[in-house]
Swiss-Prot record:
Positions of glycan attachment: N262, N505, N547, N568
Family membership: Belongs to the venom metalloproteinase (M12B) family. P-III subfamily. P-IIIc sub-subfamily.
Assembly and interaction partners: Heterodimer; disulfide-linked.
Binding site for Zn(2+): H338, H342, H348
Tissues expressing this chain: Expressed by the venom gland.
Identification of the protein by name: Zinc metalloproteinase-disintegrin-like VLAIP-B
Domain Peptidase M12B intervals: 202-398
PANTHER family, per database record: ADAM A DISINTEGRIN AND METALLOPROTEASE DOMAIN, DISINTEGRIN AND METALLOPROTEINASE DOMAIN-CONTAINING PROTEIN 28
Positions of the propeptide segment: 21-193
Cofactor binding mode and count: Binds 1 zinc ion per subunit.
Length: 614
């Protein structure tokens, strides 16, 4: 049954009829005018840099519903990576890439004083703009356009009049990564490697691409588009902190000359094209873990976005597409968090899934009463995905030099001048770290890390990442660091599985295992004659796609296209079985690096000599 992400028509509900005002979010009734008073609030250990325009920590006092509140804000120091870049294109098609200074930015996370469940995502670039949760309710704040005034409007989310529009939905219809063996709720049955992986912080290095329609939608203003993207990613950070995942914006690319792929009203075709472009082009220019296309196009039907499920870190499939469907960036950020959630193994919430709010991030319906929370179902699906797949790219911890803005003790990032950072003294759970100074306690060599045990480095030679099969190697602690060295594996092209295959990036891809993964333990590889269907160049058989056109396999490449299996389970008589679902046509293709002949492997849809491939 199709599962959809609906964007409901949110009707305004007013406790009383007040005057109306037009704000960036739209026409708003029942708003409150406030005058925030700023009070500098540097955390312990932080030193205000005289050249800074925006403080590392600030707090504001104002009233909500006539009652005073104090908003505590800390700069989102993990928002940008050290090598953050921005790319756009000149009218004559030249690519312009710059590395703008982002140390002194104006994007903050925060909380309301004396409200333990409060959250906030605020930009302080020109007044206060953003949203905060207070006593379980979501409020928006933005400056009023009154010259020489500090007046701001505060209003509840539901008090924005929405244009009447058809509901939207996410194009994802099912998960595709499920393993044969369910993961039990208890961690007692997990391997040491799995336990370590689950406990580790995760970092998603993100690229956001804005298409040509976005460029025109925002009056061809690069700065306006950048600001909108910054606001979205700042909110993404708040959302994913609840899963111990940190989002770092690596690059923004704006297709200001024209789209570099065929962006169409078909969400599926656009997602597929974007994934191909990422693998073919973007990854060769910019190191990153995940890319999201922000588009101004209206997709066919009610679709508002789409993402591949459980494919984080995979070159073509670690992508999502999101329609810029609302003036309210919080709604767009929630939709992007939803599609990235699919990349991280989460499906749509069922009716019995709960998060303690009216709506959850992976809910099939994106309601007016949006929240930052993932449901219990989403958390378990995400955990199961991490245990089964253990995607490695999101373990890359930013180096101290990756965070170039002035250090702030208590933001969970170890920055220049710090030895550890376990959060605020109230939240720190690391007995090796002094939360007040972000220095290790006397006698401690380390605070956390796979190669840290009871505040000491594990001895050299201790296995910190066991080998996962014959194409992998065990990685060992050095005795000089708390971190496990970079994952190493056997050289690509080394024979494996008794010469049934060749090692490829730490795995031994062979067709038989791929058939079992798709059809179950009784499946085997089909006869060679079945693979001749790959010469047809349609969805039943092809080798690769170029601009959404399926390219037929050459006779010598037929075993590098669609995988043909023999399903021996009862009731199946087709000797040439394929795995095909319209929502993910690429699922069921022969994996890269698979043996296609003696001394031959599949590479980009071709059967090539193993010595040439690697």
């Amino acid at each position: 049954m199709m599962q959809v992400l609906l964007v409901t028509i949110c009707l305004a509900v007013f406790p009383y009829q007040g005057s109306s005002i037009i704000l960036e979010s739209g026409n708003v009734n029942d708003y409150e005018v406030v005058y925030p008073q700023k009070i500098t609030a540097l955390p312990k250990g932080a030193i205000q840099q005289p050249e800074q325009k925006y403080e590392d920590a600030i707090k504001y006092e104002f009233k909500v519903n006539g009652k005073p509140v104090v908003l505590h804000l800390e700069k989102n120091k993990g928002l940008f990576s050290e090598d953050y870049s921005e790319t756009h294109y000149t009218p004559d098609g030249r690519e312009i890439t710059i590395n703008p200074p982002v140390e002194d930015h104006c994007y903050y996370h925060g909380r309301i004083q004396n409200d333990a469940d409060s959250t906030a995502s605020i930009s302080a670039c020109n007044g206060l703009k953003g949203h905060f949760k207070l006593q379980g309710e979501m409020y928006l704040i933005e400056p009023l356009r009154i010259p020489d005034s500090e007046a701001h409007a505060i209003y509840k989310y539901e008090n924005i009049e929405k244009e009447d529009e058809a509901p939207k939905m996410c194009g994802v219809t099912q998960t595709n990564w499920e393993s044969d063996e369910p993961i039990k709720a208890s961690q007692l049955n997990l391997t040491p490697e799995q336990r370590t992986y689950l406990k580790s912080k995760k970092y998603v290095e993100l690229v956001i691409v804005a298409d040509y329609i976005m460029f025109w939608k925002y009056d061809r203003s690069l700065s306006t588009i950048r600001t909108r993207i910054y606001e979205i990613v700042n909110t993404l950070n708040v959302i994913y902190r609840f899963l111990n995942i940190y989002i770092a914006l690596v690059a923004v690319e704006i297709w200001s000359k024209g789209d570099l792929i065929n962006v169409t009203s078909s969400a599926y075709d656009t997602l597929d094209s974007f994934g191909e472009w990422r693998e073919r082009d973007l990854l060769n220019r910019k190191r990153h873990d995940n890319a999201q296309l922000l588009t101004g196009i209206n997709f066919n039907g009610p679709s508002a976005g789409r993402g591949f499920v459980g494919r984080m870190c995979q070159p073509k499939y670690s992508v999502g597409i999101v329609q810029d469907h609302s003036k309210i960036y919080l709604l767009v950020a929630s939709a992007m968090a939803h599609e990235m959630g699919h990349n991280l193994g989460m499906d749509h919430d069922r009716i019995d899934c709960t998060c303690g709010a009216k709506s959850c991030i992976m809910s099939g319906i994106l309601r007016c009463e949006t929240s930052y929370l993932f449901s219990d179902c989403s958390r378990e699906e995400h955990r199961k995905y991490l245990i089964n797949k253990m995607p490695q790219c999101i373990l890359n911890k930013p180096l101290k030099t990756d965070i170039v803005s002035p250090a702030v003790c208590g933001n969970y990032f170890v920055e220049v001048g710090e030895e550890c950072d376990c959060g605020s003294p109230a939240n720190c759970q690391d007995r090796c770290c002094d939360a007040a100074t972000c220095k290790l306690r006397p006698g401690a060599q380390c605070g956390d890390g796979v190669c840290c045990y009871q505040c000491k480095f594990r001895r050299a030679g201790t296995v910190c990442r066991p080998a996962n099969g014959e194409c992998d190697v065990s990685d060992l602690c050095t005795g000089q660091s708390a971190e496990c060295p970079t994952d190493q594996f056997q050289r690509n092209g080394q024979p494996c599985q008794n010469n049934k295959g060749y090692c490829y990036n730490g795995t031994c891809p062979i067709m038989e295992k791929q058939c079992i993964s798709l059809f179950g333990a009784s499946a085997t590889v089909a006869q060679d004659s079945c693979f001749q269907f790959n010469r047809r160049g349609n969805h039943y058989g092809y080798c690769r796609k170029e601009n959404n056109t399926k390219i037929a396999c050459a006779p010598e490449d037929v075993k590098c296209g669609r995988l043909y299996c023999l399903d021996n389970s009862s009731g199946h008589k087709n000797p040439c079985q394929i795995y095909y679902i319209p929502s993910d046509e690429n699922k069921g293709m022969v994996d890269p690096g698979t043996k296609c002949g003696d001394g031959m492997v599949c590479s980009n849809g071709k059967c090539v000599d193993v010595t040439i491939a690697y």
